[in-house]
């Protein structure tokens, strides 16, 4: 049975796959993207192009005002983006305080307003060590709170919560997805740097699946 759902869609390969997984399940999808002052704002342009191509309703919400309250992340502040392998210590600087709770809260409110039954987002096991708001216990509790906080219960789904980026890409390949339509790099340049932790994890996923990454690198 088709349901209306909201997908938090950044434009990266994880949320791109989540978007198409929700569509493949037969859902009516509403895509929701956020500008929170991230350096890699190029991902929002990529997300818009994909939604336009597929006729998916797409809202981009500017929440950059929250940066007057939040600090300390290399994704939004004047702090160097870490290079090298996707390791816990080096990547902790990319944590935006309370980001997913903020984004999920807004997405849940949007879902209630649109009479949607669920919110999907792209948490996966590769993020568990680095991002507390991608861990199973967080997702479970957000699902509970979301169903309590409104008269209309909205479920929180993270379809790839228990698998890594390699498996996400494998599922996308099965669906025939074109990953040239995604952006992963944390640096906001014309081409992906290939050096930041996000690029490294992406490249490892393509190597593990035995295919070449279709995007251009510096």
Swiss-Prot record:
Instruction: Give its E.C. classification number.
Output: 6.3.4.20
| Entry annotated with the keyword Membrane | no
Describe which pathway this protein belongs to, using the record's wording: Purine metabolism; 7-cyano-7-deazaguanine biosynthesis
Q: Name one GO molecular function term.
A: ligase activity, forming carbon-nitrogen bonds
Alphabetical list of SUPFAM superfamilies matching this protein:
Adenine nucleotide alpha hydrolases-like (SSF52402)
Q: How is the cofactor bound?
A: Binds 1 zinc ion per subunit.
* Cofactor(s) needed: Zn(2+)
Q: Which reaction does it catalyse?
A: 7-carboxy-7-deazaguanine + NH4(+) + ATP = 7-cyano-7-deazaguanine + ADP + phosphate + H2O + H(+)
GO BP of this protein: queuosine biosynthetic process
| Annotated residues for binding of ATP | 9-19
Q: Sorted alphabetically, which keywords does the UniProt record give? A: ATP-binding, Ligase, Metal-binding, Nucleotide-binding, Queuosine biosynthesis, Zinc
Provide the binding site for Zn(2+): 185, 193, 196, 199
Q: Which family does it belong to?
A: Belongs to the QueC family.
Q: Which NCBIfam families match?
A: 7-cyano-7-deazaguanine synthase QueC (TIGR00364)
Function description: Catalyzes the ATP-dependent conversion of 7-carboxy-7-deazaguanine (CDG) to 7-cyano-7-deazaguanine (preQ(0)).
Q: Which HAMAP family match?
A: QueC
> Which PANTHER family does the entry mention?
7-CYANO-7-DEAZAGUANINE SYNTHASE (PTHR42914:SF1)
Q: What is this protein called?
A: 7-cyano-7-deazaguanine synthase
Which gene carries the instructions for this protein? queC
């Amino acid at each position: 049975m088709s349901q209306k759902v909201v997908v938090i869609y950044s434009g990266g390969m994880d949320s791109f796959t989540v978007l198409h997984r929700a569509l493949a399940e037969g859902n009516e999808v509403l895509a929701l993207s956020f500008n929170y002052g991230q350096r890699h704002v190029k991902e929002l342009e990529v997300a818009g192009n994909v939604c336009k191509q597929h006729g998916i309703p797409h809202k981009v919400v500017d929440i950059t005002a929250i940066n007057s309250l939040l600090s300390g992340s290399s994704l939004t502040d004047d702090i160097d983006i870490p290079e090298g392998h996707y390791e816990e210590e080096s990547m902790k600087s990319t944590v935006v305080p309370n980001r997913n709770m903020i984004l999920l809260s807004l997405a849940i409110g949007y879902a209630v307003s649109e009479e949607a039954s669920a919110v999907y987002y792209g948490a996966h096991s590769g993020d568990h060590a680095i991002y507390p708001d991608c861990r199973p216990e967080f997702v479970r509790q957000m699902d509970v709170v979301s169903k309590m906080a409104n008269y209309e219960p909205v479920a929180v789904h993270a379809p790839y919560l228990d698998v890594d980026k390699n498996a996400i890409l494998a599922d996308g390949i099965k669906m025939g997805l074109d990953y040239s339509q995604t952006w992963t790099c944390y640096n906001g340049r014309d081409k992906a740097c290939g050096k930041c932790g996000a690029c490294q994890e992406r490249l490892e996923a393509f190597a593990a699946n035995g295919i070449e990454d279709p995007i251009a690198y510096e």
